[in-house]
């Protein structure tokens, strides 16, 4: 899967992202695409829209598993790196729920990043 195919997949689970993807500079590379999707996930976390949030987390995992190397790097560099920041203000119970619902592939990438950084 390349970043153009990822956009189509993202729009299926987060139709609100369509508007952002209409701005062409946001569709030019994998990093911009994952940045838009990460912002959509952050909005869902703030709205506490658990059903759509879980669908989006699963879609992010699918992009991570099936995406080309650039998409995988973008997911690790943007989404995984942002997880702590976007869940920082959540109540502990809600934060735990989010991390429980993150698919295994993304959980492993998150743990690799946390342990690699020496934290």
In which residue ranges do the predicted regions lie?
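Long, low-complexity, highly charged intrinsically disordered regions
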Residues: 1-30
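Amphipathic protein-protein interaction modules
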Residues: 47-98
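Eukaryotic alpha-helical solenoid repeat scaffolds
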Residues: 3-9, 88-90, 118-119
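Eukaryotic acidic, Ser/Thr-rich intrinsically disordered low-complexity regions
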Residues: 91-119
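HEAT-repeat alpha-solenoid elements in large eukaryotic scaffold proteins
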Residues: 30-39
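Helix-loop junctions that connect tandem helical modules in alpha-solenoid scaffolds
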Residues: 20-25, 63-64, 109-113
């Amino acid at each position: 899967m390349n970043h153009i195919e990822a956009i189509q997949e993202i729009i299926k689970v987060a139709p609100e992202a369509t508007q952002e993807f209409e701005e062409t500079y946001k569709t030019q590379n994998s990093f911009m695409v994952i940045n838009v999707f990460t912002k959509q996930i952050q909005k869902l976390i703030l709205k506490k829209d658990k059903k759509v949030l879980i669908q989006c987390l699963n879609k992010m995992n699918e992009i991570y598993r099936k995406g080309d190397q650039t998409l995988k790097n973008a997911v690790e560099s943007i989404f995984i790196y942002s997880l702590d920041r976007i869940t920082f203000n959540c109540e502990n119970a809600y934060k735990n729920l989010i991390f429980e619902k993150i698919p295994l592939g993304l959980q492993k990438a998150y743990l690799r990043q946390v342990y690699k950084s020496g934290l």
